[in-house]
C-alpha cells in the first residue's frame, strides 16, 4: 500500500492544478454498490474489501470512511498509515476536508465515480473555505494500477416476457408518460439495474448481479442503449430494435447527452414545449451532468426506481416460487450439516437437541470449515431449477467471525466449524427469473447449555423485533424509517442496537439490494407500496464473541382491516421465506404467548409448503425441527 500511495501522491503533485487531496469512491461510472474487479479502485488503494466506503488521500494522510456494517472488518484489513473513519460517528468526509485542508485547496475526484448530489454537497462545503473540487480528466488510480483486470465482454441476454411480466414497449410507454408529465424531453438512465429492467436484458458484468455495463437515454420518441457492442448478439439487437431501442457504443453517451440537450439527437425529440433533461441526482455521474446546462436539468429520482420496485404479478409469483425452492435447499443443507456434526463431534444433533463434545470423534474425518460448508449450501441451491449463481458472497461465519456483519470467509484463513460456537449463515441466490435473499431464519448452532448469558438474553429480543416488524399493519403512505423502530425496540429496552439497516427491497433477477424503499434508522421519504418487497433482518453483534441476525423476505400486501380511518387504506406484510427457526437457541420464556403462537403457525406453514420438495429423511427432520414450541 505504501508504494501505491507514493505513486498517487506523485501524480497529485504533478496534476494541473496540484491536488491537496484525492477522493477515491467505491462506486463505478454507474454509482453501483457492487462493482466489477476492474472498478474496485478504493479496495486497490486501501486494502479494505467491504462493499461500501470512501478513501481520501492527502499528502500526509490516508483515511477510509465506511458504515457500521464494516467497522470491525475495516479495523482488521486496514494497514500502514490508513486510518478508519466511522460514518455517523466521525466527521463526514466533506466536513473533514473543509476543516482539515488548507483554504484554496484543490480536491481531485474522477467525476464519473461520484454522483451529482454528492459532488454538489461537497462543493457547498468547500465554498466556505474557497476550496475547489477538481474533476480529473483521467482516473489517477487507473494510472498506477499495473495489473488492472480487463474490461468484461460477457454476452447480453434477453429476459423473456414470461419471466419479466411486462414488455419493453409497455415500460417505455409508461416512462414517456412520466416524461410528458414533468415536461422533460428525455431522461438519462445510468443505474445498471434500471437499464436492465427497462430493456428486459441481463448480463454478468458484475459478480452476483445479472446486469450489463450500459447507459440508456429515452426521449419522447426514441430510446437508446449504450453498451460495448461486442457483448450484443444479432438476436439481442433484433429484439431491442423490435422494441424501439437503438444500440450505440458505450462511450457515445458522453456526446449524445450534449446532443440531447440541444435536441439534435437523431431522431429529434417531439419537444412540445419540453426542454428539460431528467437526471437522477443520486445515480447520474457528475461527469455527465457537467456536460449539460444545469438550468435545464430536472434533478429528480428516476421514475424507474419506483416502477421496478413495485413488482408485477409475474414477478411476485416467481419470487414466491423461488423462495419455496430455496427453503427446501436450506433444509437439505441443515440436515446434511446436522449429520456431519454428529459424525465428527458425536452430537445427537447440531440444529436439534443433543450434547456435543469439544473434541473430534475421530481424526480422519474431512475438515468442515466456513468455506466448505458454504460450498455445500451452494451445491444444494445449484440443484434447483433455474439456478444462476449466488446473489452476494455467502456470509458463513463461526464464533467471533459472526460479529463481522459482512464477513466473507477465505479458504486460506477461514475458521473450522465448532459445535461450541455460534454459526451464522447469510446467503442468497439468483434464479433465472428471480432473486432471493434467504437466511436460515435462525442461524446460530450450539448447545443452549454452553451459551453465554448475553446470547441467551439477546436472541429472543432479536426474534421479538423480527416478529413485530413482520406482523406490522400500517397506513398507506408510511415510510420505512417509521417502521424501523418495531424491529429495534426490544433491543433498545436493554440499551442495545445494531448498526445496519433493518430491511431493503430485492430485485427480480437483479440486485439483492434494491430501492428506493428502505426500512432503516436513516430517514428516506419513500412510501412503502403494495407489491414491494422488503427484508426483515434485525440483529445483534458482540465483537469478539458472536453475531445474531434473523431474516425473512416480505411482500407488501393490502391489509384487510375492520375499519379504514381517513380512507387511507392499510397495508401489511406477507412472509415468503420458508425455513425453520432454531428453537433450541431461543429462550422461549422470554416470548409472549402471541409470539409463540406466531412461531408455531409459521413452522406449520413451513412443513406444509416444503414437504413436497423433501425426501423422507429430510421431511422427518423438518417435522422434528418444527414441533410446536411452548414456554
PLM segments and residue spans:
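Active-site neighborhoods and metal-handling regions in enzymes and metal-associated proteins
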Residues: 1-631
Amino acid at each position: 500500500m505504501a508504494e501505491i500511495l507514493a505513486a498517487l501522491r506523485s501524480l497529485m503533485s504533478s496534476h494541473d492544478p496540484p491536488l491537496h487531496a484525492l477522493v477515491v469512491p467505491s462506486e463505478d461510472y454507474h454509482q453501483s454498490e457492487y462493482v466489477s474487479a476492474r472498478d474496485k479502485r478504493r479496495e486497490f488503494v486501501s486494502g479494505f474489501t467491504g462493499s461500501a466506503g470512501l478513501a481520501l488521500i492527502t499528502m500526509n494522510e490516508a483515511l477510509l470512511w465506511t458504515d457500521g456494517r464494516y467497522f470491525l472488518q475495516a479495523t482488521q484489513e486496514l494497514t500502514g498509515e490508513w486510518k478508519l473513519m466511522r460514518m455517523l460517528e466521525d466527521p463526514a468526509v466533506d466536513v473533514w476536508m473543509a476543516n482539515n485542508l488548507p483554504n484554496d485547496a484543490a480536491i481531485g475526484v474522477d467525476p464519473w465515480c461520484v454522483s451529482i448530489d454528492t459532488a454538489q454537497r461537497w462543493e457547498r462545503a468547500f465554498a466556505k473555505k474557497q476550496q475547489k473540487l477538481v474533476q480529473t480528466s483521467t482516473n489517477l488510480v487507473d494510472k498506477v494500477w499495473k495489473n488492472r483486470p480487463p474490461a468484461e465482454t460477457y454476452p447480453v441476454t434477453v429476459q423473456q416476457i414470461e419471466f419479466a411480466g411486462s414488455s419493453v414497449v409497455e415500460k417505455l410507454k409508461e416512462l414517456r408518460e412520466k416524461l410528458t408529465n414533468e415536461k422533460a424531453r428525455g431522461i438519462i438512465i445510468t443505474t445498471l439495474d434500471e437499464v436492465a429492467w427497462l430493456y428486459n436484458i441481463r448480463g454478468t458484468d458484475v459478480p452476483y448481479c445479472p446486469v450489463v455495463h450500459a447507459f440508456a437515454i429515452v426521449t419522447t420518441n426514441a430510446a437508446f442503449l449504450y453498451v460495448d457492442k461486442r457483448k450484443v448478439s444479432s438476436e439481442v439487437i433484433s429484439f431491442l430494435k423490435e422494441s424501439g431501442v437503438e444500440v450505440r457504443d458505450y462511450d457515445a453517451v458522453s456526446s449524445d447527452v450534449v446532443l440531447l440537450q440541444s435536441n439534435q439527437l437523431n431522431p429529434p425529440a417531439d419537444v412540445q414545449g419540453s426542454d428539460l433533461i431528467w437526471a437522477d441526482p443520486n445515480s447520474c455521474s457528475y461527469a455527465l451532468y457537467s456536460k449539460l446546462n444545469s438550468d435545464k436539468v430536472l434533478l429528480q429520482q428516476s421514475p424507474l426506481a419506483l416502477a421496478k420496485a413495485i413488482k408485477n404479478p409475474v414477478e411476485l409469483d416467481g419470487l414466491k416460487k423461488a423462495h419455496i425452492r430455496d427453503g427446501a435447499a436450506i433444509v437439505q443443507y441443515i440436515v446434511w450439516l446436522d449429520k456431519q456434526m454428529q459424525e465428527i463431534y458425536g452430537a445427537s444433533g447440531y440444529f436439534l437437541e443433543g450434547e456435543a463434545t469439544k473434541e473430534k470423534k475421530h481424526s480422519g474425518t474431512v475438515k468442515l470449515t466456513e468455506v466448505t460448508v458454504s460450498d455445500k449450501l451452494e451445491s444444494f441451491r445449484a440443484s434447483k431449477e433455474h439456478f444462476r449463481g449466488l446473489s452476494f458472497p455467502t456470509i458463513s461465519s463461526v464464533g467471533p467471525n459472526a460479529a463481522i456483519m459482512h464477513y466473507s470467509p477465505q479458504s486460506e484463513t477461514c475458521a473450522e466449524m465448532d459445535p461450541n460456537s455460534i454459526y451464522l449463515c447469510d446467503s442468497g441466490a439468483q434464479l433465472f427469473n428471480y432473486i432471493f435473499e434467504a437466511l436460515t431464519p435462525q442461524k446460530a448452532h450450539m448447545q443452549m447449555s454452553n451459551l453465554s448469558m448475553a446470547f441467551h438474553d439477546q436472541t429472543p429480543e432479536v426474534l421479538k423485533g423480527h416478529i413485530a416488524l413482520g406482523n406490522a399493519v400500517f397506513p398507506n403512505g408510511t415510510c420505512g424509517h417509521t417502521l424501523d423502530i418495531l424491529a429495534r425496540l426490544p433491543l433498545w429496552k436493554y440499551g442495545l442496537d445494531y448498526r445496519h439497516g433493518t430491511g431493503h427491497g430485492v430485485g427480480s433477477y437483479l440486485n439483492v439490494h434494491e430501492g428506493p424503499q428502505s426500512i432503516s434508522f436513516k430517514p428516506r421519504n419513500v412510501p412503502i407500496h403494495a407489491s414491494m418487497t422488503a427484508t426483515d433482518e434485525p440483529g445483534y453483534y458482540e465483537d469478539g464473541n458472536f453475531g445474531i441476525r434473523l431474516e425473512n423476505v416480505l411482500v407488501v400486501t393490502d391489509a384487510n382491516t375492520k375499519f379504514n380511518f381517513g380512507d387511507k387504506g392499510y397495508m401489511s406484510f406477507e412472509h415468503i421465506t420458508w425455513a425453520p427457526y432454531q428453537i433450541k437457541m431461543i429462550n422461549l420464556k422470554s416470548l409472549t404467548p402471541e409470539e409463540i403462537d406466531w412461531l408455531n403457525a409459521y413452522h406449520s406453514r413451513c412443513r406444509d409448503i416444503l414437504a413436497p420438495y423433501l425426501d423422507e429423511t429430510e421431511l422427518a427432520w423438518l417435522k422434528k425441527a418444527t414441533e410446536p414450541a411452548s414456554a
